[in-house]
Amino acid sequence: MKRDHSNKLSCFPQNIDGRICGYDNDNLKMPNKIIEMGLLPDTLFKILYQAPFNGPLYIEFGEEKSRIALRVEEAQFIIVESTTA
């Protein structure tokens, strides 16, 4: 898949391997905690589950396979691409 900067983590499908490309720099309200949690560019991830009614995303990421829940509103700041052929 070609790098497409319109792909946001909030719209990424479940159980597909992906890579964080960067952040939506047009929006200056991006929470610093996204970076502090370790969701850095080139980090590999997979969305394991999304809670019902557009709830938080449960994400596994990094070499240590860390897991966090991330609000959809925060996931909209993260630009991603698929690493699956």
What is each model feature region?
Residues 4-11, 66-71:
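PDZ/PDZ-like peptide-tail recognition elements
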Residues 11, 22, 47-49:
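A residue-level detector for short acidic-glycine micro-motifs
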Residues 58-85:
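C-terminal structural segments of small proteins and small subunits
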